[in-house]
Amino acid sequence: MPRRARKFKRAVAPDSRYNSLMLSNFINKLMMHGQKATAQRIVYDAIDIMGKQENKEGLAVFEQGLKNATPFIEVKPRRVGGATYQVPIEVRPDRAQTMAMRWIIKAARKRTGKSMAERLAAEMLEASREQGAAVKKREETHKMAEANRAFVHYRW
């Protein structure tokens, strides 16, 4: 029996402008040093930029980009008799969404020049078109899982 109490997930309030839980989580992932207002401004500006460039609703482009960057399967190392195998496992939906958000933010931060809102908008637009670094990372993850399909029976 575990000695520590179970850690329960905190309920995250939806964001103020679009009333979206997913967007609220994204803002929290983007936030650095507790600067939530700055993170909100960056995300809302990025959504406005995406909406103008695509002539669609910015939130729809955001959701499509996030969906395209979301992985379905990943590999986890599993040690079996002295050898470490990369075992493919299915990703829980909440973890998959978190991974996609993390990859998009990382790719946007890596881009050079311009404001963060513009870089984030550019990365999201590319992700919504099945391009960009975040989608490439998802494809890489899927390829790795496909290559290690032989070890799927080591799943736990």
Curated annotation (Swiss-Prot):
Which is one Gene Ontology cellular component term of this protein? Answer: small ribosomal subunit
Q: Name one GO molecular function term.
A: structural constituent of ribosome
Iron-sulfur as UniProt keyword: no
Disulphide bonds in the chain: none
Pfam families on file: Ribosomal_S7
Q: Which InterPro entries match?
A: Ribosomal_uS7, Ribosomal_uS7_bac/org-type, Ribosomal_uS7_dom, Ribosomal_uS7_dom_sf
Q: Name one GO biological process term.
A: translation
Q: Which UniProt keywords apply?
A: Ribonucleoprotein, Ribosomal protein, RNA-binding, rRNA-binding, tRNA-binding
> Transmembrane region positions?
none
Role summary? One of the primary rRNA binding proteins, it binds directly to 16S rRNA where it nucleates assembly of the head domain of the 30S subunit. Is located at the subunit interface close to the decoding center, probably blocks exit of the E-site tRNA.
Q: How does it assemble?
A: Part of the 30S ribosomal subunit. Contacts proteins S9 and S11.
Family assignment? Answer: Belongs to the universal ribosomal protein uS7 family.
Protein name in the entry: Small ribosomal subunit protein uS7
| Native species | Dehalococcoides mccartyi (strain ATCC BAA-2266 / KCTC 15142 / 195) (Dehalococcoides ethenogenes (strain 195))
